[in-house]
């Protein structure tokens, strides 16, 4: 539920930008530059915090900070394509994060209620449905082709091509964030 509710204020922000303030005046006031900066920082900081986390529930929550950073970055591009990418990501992230949290419950259930990574070893074999669901959710969050996370990242990258001076920054941060996402969703050997 929190994966959907936590984005209600972003819908409100977009509505205010388009209906109350007029998006062109928001762009000319450079408010979108602040959102872009917050988005970029959120993407990196949330991912770094998720990598350091040893508890799967908290790691997934920190991942949400990074994913909300994507949304702010998209709005901060200051283009309609960026807002469309952000809206798609809200839906994609809401669905995949819900899938992740539900599957985590199934995995911890077969691990005596423990949610640290060491206790979860083999949990996907003990609860195959939860293991498969977690795999799909993780791969989508990373941006595996054909999954909604990939479509989101593609939309952000495409929107960045029309964002002028923000294009290179957006592309670089998208690439770095994707690598960081992979580190906290797949590479957990060092935890």
Regions found by a protein language model. Give the residues of each.
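Conserved small/polar residues in nucleotide/adenosyl-binding loops
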Residues: 191
